[in-house]
Each structure stands twice: as structure tokens, then as C-alpha cells.
Amino acid sequence: MKFGVLVFPGSNCDHDAYWTVQQVARQPVTFLWHEAHDLENCDAIIVPGGFAYGDYLRTGAIAKFSPVMASVKKFADAGGLVLGICNGFQILCEAGLLPGALMRNVGLKYICKPVQVRVETTDTPFTNACRQGEVLTIPIGHMEGNYFCDPSTLAELQRDSRIVFRYSAPDGRITPGANPNGSLDNIAGICSPGRNVLGMMPHPERAAEPELGGTDGFKVFQSLVGTMVAR
């Protein structure tokens, strides 16, 4: 099993993801530079958070043209596991691997704080170590986390159980007050039709060790490793 962590100019959570995979999950991992075409036989790809290309034009709008993203798309189309975190989620949407877009937060301010998200489905390679309806506490840190899509896409996401995480109150209720950024239907994370690509705004790598204040985020990595072992 081997993980690959993409590195774009402006990425700043790549080392956090690398550390979590190598030091916490105890799995082999390598960095993959944005100009690379070869994914080096990785079994799972992480598109990390940060500010790829300075977030110029739009978040992820330039990163989607990086050579490595063409390889990631082929990898995903073949069933490869891809996890996009924060800016990585934005990049996956821009690249067409996930539907919709991430817009400016409704308050037009950068938000950095722990939030609660409810696990809406465990039928993904990223959440099979969780319980249905489980509430996880995971930090966010973004300016453009306001997920939006057209009504037909939202209906499709709901119908196919592709909304993986939703912002919730600590008791699991989905309320407007639990929504930190105005995201449509309190969406915090969605998956692809094949369920092998996940984009999420919260940072699971920032909640993977007790020293960081919690380990709820590690369940995403635990799920991935378990899936890869079973394959």
C-alpha cells in the first residue's frame, strides 16, 4: 500500500497529510510534484489543503491544469482512491472529478475553528470505519467553503447518498446555526458516483492525534487503510 500527496506551489497542508499517513497511520507515502505525470504506483492520492497557485482567479482554477491532475483523473476514472481536503476539494470540483463549486463563505471571512460534522453514509472507502450518524469534531480553515450546486445535482447527491459529511450540532441535528459557511444543505463533503473520490472541507489530518486535541479525523485515514488492505 502506498499513498501519494500532491504538492502544488502554495500548498501548505501537504506535510501535515504526509505526517499523518507516515507517522500515525504507519503507511508508505511519497510527495508528488504538480509537474509529475507518473503517480509512482500509489494506491491512494491525497490532494491537500493550502492555496494552490495562490488561489488566483479562483480556488483550484489554475491547479486543475497541472500535469499531475490529468494523471489523477485517469487514476480516479480507473477506480483509484482520491481524497481532496479543503483546497483539494476545491481543486477536485474545478477539475470535474466532483460536481459543484466552493464559493466565498457567507460572512466573507476566513474561518478557522473546530466544527462538528455528521457521517451521512459509511458506504465509502473513507468512512467505513465510522458509524452511520456519528458526529465527528474536525477543524476547518477556509475562506471559500460554501458548497453550491444546481438543484438537479443536489437531488442526485441526496438520492445516491453521495453527501458524506454534513455540518451538524454536537448532538447531530442539522441546523442553520451549525453551518459555518452557508454551504448548501449543510454539505461538508461529497463523493463521486463511483464513491472512490471524496472531497471534504474539514481537515482530518488536523484531528489525527491526541496532541492536536482530538482523533476523530483519523477515522478517515483508518477507513482508507482498511479499504486498501481489503482490496
Q: What do these predicted ranges mean?
A:
Residues M1-I85, C93-P99, M103-I111, R118, ...:
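N-terminal beta1-alpha1 cap of cysteine-dependent amidohydrolase-like domains
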Residues G50-F51, G88, M143, P204:
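Active-site metal-binding loops of divalent metal-dependent hydrolases
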Residues A52-Y53, F89-I91, N146-Y147, D171:
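Glycine-rich nucleotide phosphate-binding loop and flanking beta-alpha elements
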Residues K73-D77, N105-R231:
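Amide-donor transfer/coupling interface in amidating biosynthetic enzymes
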Residues G88-F89, D123:
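Short, flexible active-site-adjacent loop segments at beta-strand->alpha-helix junctions, enriched
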